[in-house]
C-alpha cells in the first residue's frame, strides 16, 4: 500500500489584490470626507458621532447608512485592518514554508517606507501654507480654522516629522501614520501573540479580545488603534498558513453579506446609539463589520468584480499617495475660493489632486519604496557580516 504524501506547504506568497481594491476605495472615502468638512455644517459634525446637524439633508447624510459615502474615520479603520494583514501575511508565509523572516531587513525598510513619504507630504503642506496662508475666518467652519491653524514653528515641524500626532496639523492625515508607526514597532510582539494563539488552535482569540476593547471602552482609538491592527494581523497569520486563500468563484452569499457589513460600519451614527451602553455596542459592531468586510472580500470573494476592476486596482496602487497629498490641496483650494460655495471644493480638489497624486507616486512613493528595500538589504547584509 503506497504511503500518503507528506502535507504540502503553502507556495510563494501571492498578493492579496482584494486588499488593494479595498484600500483604494477607502482612500476615496477619506477624500470625500475631507471635502465635506469644508462645508461648515459637516465640519461641526466631524469624524465621530455626537453632533446632529439641524439641516434635514445633512442629517440624512449623517445618521443613515448614507454616511458610508463620507465615513472618513471608519475608512481609516479599514486601512489599519489591511495594514495588520499586509504586514503579518508575508511573515506567516515564510513561517509556513519553514523559512525565517528577516527582521533586521524589516526594520529599516519599514522606517524608510513610512517616514520618507510622510516627510514629503509635510513639505507639500508647508509649501502650500506659505503660498496660501491659512485663515481664522469663522465663516470657513471649525475644520478649516481649528484643525489648520497658522504658524510654522521649527520645533513643531520637527515633532511633526517625527510623526508625533499632536503636531501633525499641517497635514492632518499624518495622525494615522503615527498609529502605523506604533504598530510597526510592535509587529514582532504582535506576531508572537498571534502565533502562540494559533499554535494552541485558538487563532481567533486575539481577534475576539480586540473586538472586546471597543465594547468596554466605547472607542476604537484605545491603545493607539493597536487592537484594530491586531484584527488584521490575526487574519494575516491565519491566511499565511493556507494553501488556497481566495476561492475560485465568489460565494453567492458573499456580496450581500459584505453589503450588510458596509451598512453596519455606520451603526455608530444611527439615531439613539450614542448613549454610554449603546455607544459601546455600536463601536464594537462597527469594528467587527470592518473586519468581516475584509474577510469576506478575501476568503469568500465578496465584491470581487468591483475590487479587481482595473480602475479600483489603479486607485489602490496610488492610494497611499492620494491619502498623503489630498488634504493640504483641499485646504488650499477652500482658502483660495473662500467667497465661493464650499460645494465647489470637491470637483476642484479632484482636478488638482489626481495629477498631483500621480506625480507624488512617481517621484516620491515609488522611489521611497525602492530605497526602503535597498536599505533593508544593506543593513541586513552588514549585520550578517558582523555576526560571522
Per-range role (PLM):
Residues 1-18, 32-72, 89-98, 190-198, ...:
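Alpha-helical transmembrane segments in multi-pass integral membrane proteins
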Amino acid at each position: 500500500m503506497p504511503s500518503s504524501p507528506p502535507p504540502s506547504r503553502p507556495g510563494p506568497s501571492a498578493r492579496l489584490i482584494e486588499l488593494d481594491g479595498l484600500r483604494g476605495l477607502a482612500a476615496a472615502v477619506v477624500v470625500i470626507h475631507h471635502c465635506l468638512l469644508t462645508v461648515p455644517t459637516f465640519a461641526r459634525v466631524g469624524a465621530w458621532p455626537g453632533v446632529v446637524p439641524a439641516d434635514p439633508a445633512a442629517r440624512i447624510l449623517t445618521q443613515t447608512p448614507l454616511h458610508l459615502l463620507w465615513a472618513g474615520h471608519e475608512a481609516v479603520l479599514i486601512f489599519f485592518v489591511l495594514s495588520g494583514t499586509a504586514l503579518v501575511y508575508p511573515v506567516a508565509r515564510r513561517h509556513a514554508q519553514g523559512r525565517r523572516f528577516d527582521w533586521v531587513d524589516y526594520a529599516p525598510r519599514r522606517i524608510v517606507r513610512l517616514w520618507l513619504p510622510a516627510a514629503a507630504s509635510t513639505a507639500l503642506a508647508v509649501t502650500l501654507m506659505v503660498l496660501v496662508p491659512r485663515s481664522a475666518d469663522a465663516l470657513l467652519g471649525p475644520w478649516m480654522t481649528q484643525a489648520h491653524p497658522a504658524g510654522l514653528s521649527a520645533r513643531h515641524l520637527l515633532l511633526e516629522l517625527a510623526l508625533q500626532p499632536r503636531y501633525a496639523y499641517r497635514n492632518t492625515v499624518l495622525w494615522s501614520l503615527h498609529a502605523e508607526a506604533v504598530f510597526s514597532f510592535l509587529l514582532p510582539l504582535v506576531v508572537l501573540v498571534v502565533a502562540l494563539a494559533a499554535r494552541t488552535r485558538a487563532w481567533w482569540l486575539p481577534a475576539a479580545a480586540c473586538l472586546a476593547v471597543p465594547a468596554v471602552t466605547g472607542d476604537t482609538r484605545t491603545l493607539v488603534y493597536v487592537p484594530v491592527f491586531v484584527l488584521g494581523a490575526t487574519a494575516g497569520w491565519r491566511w499565511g498558513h493556507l494553501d488556497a486563500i481566495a476561492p475560485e468563484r465568489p460565494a453567492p452569499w458573499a456580496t450581500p453579506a459584505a453589503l450588510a457589513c458596509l451598512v453596519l460600519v455606520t451603526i455608530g451614527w444611527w439615531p439613539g446609539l450614542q448613549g454610554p451602553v449603546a455607544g459601546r455596542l455600536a463601536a464594537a459592531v462597527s469594528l467587527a463589520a470592518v473586519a468581516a468586510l475584509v474577510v469576506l472580500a478575501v476568503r469568500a470573494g465578496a465584491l470581487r468584480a468591483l475590487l479587481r476592476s482595473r480602475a479600483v486596482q489603479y486607485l489602490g496602487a496610488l492610494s497611499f499617495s492620494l491619502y498623503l497629498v489630498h488634504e493640504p490641496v483641499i485646504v488650499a483650494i477652500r482658502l483660495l475660493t473662500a467667497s465661493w460655495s464650499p460645494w465647489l471644493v470637491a470637483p476642484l480638489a479632484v482636478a488638482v489632486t489626481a495629477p498631483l497624486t500621480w506625480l507624488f507616486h512617481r517621484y516620491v512613493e515609488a522611489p521611497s519604496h525602492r530605497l526602503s528595500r535597498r536599505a533593508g538589504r544593506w543593513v541586513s547584509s552588514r549585520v550578517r557580516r558582523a555576526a560571522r
